Amino acid sequence: MKFRFAALASVALLTSTVSVAGVVTSSSNIDFLAIDGQKPSKSLLKEKRSFNVSDTLPHQVVVRVAEIIRTGSDRSLYESDPIVVTFQGTTDDIIISAPRLETERDANAFKKSPKITVKTVSGVEIATKQEYLKQEGFLPGINLIENLSEYNASGAPAAVARLASTTMPAAIPGFGKAQKGKITVQGENVAEQMLQYWYQQADKETQQRFLSWAKGQK
């Protein structure tokens, strides 16, 4: 009996001191570009759009909102600039979402005043700090992690100081082919260079699907 009581007491002590992690997921129109100062990797993402957070720390994600929108009688891809979102972790699971964008008017309104919502699965809204991450130069996504590190060191509204030193510009194993070596793009126009860049960013399965799709376009 004494042994059982001691064992139960030990379990209670451990559960009271160990930080419980919540799971963060996102709406289908959100892509995670960075999670707590690092590029998303297989070790960070449990699935395509989910990862764990500690309930004792503030967390930061950089997201991009992407939607197929109507532009007159046509349809086109809208992609937002990177948005930094900082929020406090919780033991509850969390959903990060963006409003649905269906028209060019919706996209322009969102671009002017972006709003990313962070809520628990029970519907309680979590306070956030958010703003665009300033990007410069050609193919700015290549330097996103370095820009984020500088942002976190700047004391900006959504900055997290502890991530300024932990941000890793270097490759993270398991995140795809492009992270294993230098990315080189060559082409006669920006569209061709962008295709080369995103192809090198993709994992092997995505590259294969893209090649199959491209062959079907001939």
From Swiss-Prot:
It comes from the Bacteria. Pfam families: DUF2057 (PF09829). Belongs to the UPF0319 family. Keywords: Signal. Residues 1-21 form the signal peptide. This is UPF0319 protein PM0395. NCBIfam families: PRK01904.1.
